[in-house]
UniProtKB/Swiss-Prot annotation:
Name of a matching Pfam family: Fasciclin
Boundaries of every FAS1 domain copy: 1-47
SUPFAM superfamilies: FAS1 domain (SSF82153)
Name of this protein: Fasciclin-like arabinogalactan protein
Family classification: Belongs to the fasciclin-like AGP family.
Superkingdom, taxonomy of origin: Eukaryota
Signal peptide (residue range): none
InterPro entries from the UniProt entry: FAS1_dom_sf, FAS1_domain
Function: May be a cell surface adhesion protein.
Amino acid sequence: APTPATLNGLTIFAPNDEAFKATGVPDLSKLSNAPMVSLLQYHAAAR
């Protein structure tokens, strides 16, 4: 299960590797900024 971590009022849910692989993106480091931001917005919540 993902473990939430809180930093300055922001909670980030860190999925495991299998969950990121399910996005269909073979290498997250090759994403440009806009798709990366879109993907990460699903894993962060304000307190």
